Design a protein with these regions (language model features):
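Conserved N-terminal glycine/acidic-rich loop preference
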Residues: 123, 130-132, 137-145, 162-163, ...
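Canonical Radical SAM [4Fe-4S] cluster-binding loop centered on the CxxxCxxC motif
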Residues: 142-144, 148-177
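N-terminal [4Fe-4S]-dependent radical SAM core
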Residues: 94-150
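Non-catalytic protein-protein interaction scaffold segments in large eukaryotic complex-forming proteins
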Residues: 22-62
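N-terminal accessory interaction module
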Residues: 58, 66-105
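Short hydrophobic targeting helices and cationic amphipathic motifs
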Residues: 3, 8, 15-17
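Core AdoMet radical
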Residues: 148, 167-175, 190-205, 213-230, ...
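Generic structural signal for well-ordered alpha-helices
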Residues: 184, 209-213, 235
Length: 243
């Protein structure tokens, strides 16, 4: 791995260098490194994580450069989410775009370790890495493999809002911890690393949700919540697990 780290140090330098070295030399070295590093290898995954450090320094400029890295590895491969990458580039190339402004706020105002975990789990695992596995599984099983899995940990809710199905149909339906854990483990085998919780109110089960975040630290979790069960203790736990 020492050689790999040295290569990645050169690679990161070339990708983000802004000095006076010949542009032609830099471009040729970039091409050489891209050619010799297989995009599915652990080395490339490590390199992209390393590149995250550069985003922290200047998100507006270096986020664009990071997408350039991904584009170089993806090439014209139809399995590498070309349409999604193009849509993302339109957003980051337009500073007046609302999504662009939201991303910059997240990068600048959110705890650094939380942003790092989101980068690794959402951008790398759920997209760059997971998508390739999903495509392989779609061909293997001749069926669709979802990009994300949505599940209801419980139908219970601490509120009784007029018109909401949770208030009308009761709160007796629950997935056990082991059932949710099994869904996530099976999903990861298919390349799925993004899980969305709805309900009911998912935070009725917040101890289980934190435990699942801790166990599946390579996944990204999103929860639709009414927010009333978020307290200081739970906020500290979310900061601790980061995903």
């Amino acid at each position: 791995m020492c050689l790999g780290v040295k290569i990645l140090d050169i690679w990161a330098f070339c990708l983000f260098y802004e000095g006076t070295i010949s542009v032609i030399v830099i471009k040729n070295l970039r091409k050489w490194l891209v050619f010799h590093m297989n995009r599915s290898s652990k080395l490339v995954q490590f390199g992209l994580k390393k590149a995250f450090r550069y985003i922290e320094k200047d998100p507006e400029k270096n986020l664009v450069k990071l997408l350039d890295i991904v584009d170089q590895f993806a090439g014209d491969d139809p399995n590498m989410m070309g349409k999604q990458r193009a849509a993302f580039r339109r957003v980051i190339d337009d500073p007046d775009n609302n999504m662009n402004q939201l991303m910059m706020r997240v990068l600048k105002d959110t705890d650094t370790e939380v942003v790092k975990a989101m980068f690794e789990n959402f951008f790398l695992n759920a997209n760059f890495i997971g998508w390739q596995t999903q495509e392989e599984m779609r061909k293997k099983y001749n069926c669709n493999i979802p990009w994300a899995i949505l599940l209801d940990p419980t139908s219970a809710c601490n509120l009784k809002c007029t018109g909401c199905w949770a208030a009308e149909y009761g709160n007796k339906l629950n997935l056990t911890f082991d059932e949710i854990d099994s869904i996530i483990m099976q999903g990861k085998e298919l390349g799925v690393y993004l899980y969305i919780y709805t309900g009911g109110e998912p935070l009725v089960r917040k101890k289980d949700l934190i435990a699942l975040c801790r166990k599946h630290h390579d996944c990204q979790f999103l929860t639709f919540t009414n927010g009333t069960l978020i307290d200081e203790e739970f906020a500290d736990q979310m900061l601790d697990v980061k995903n």
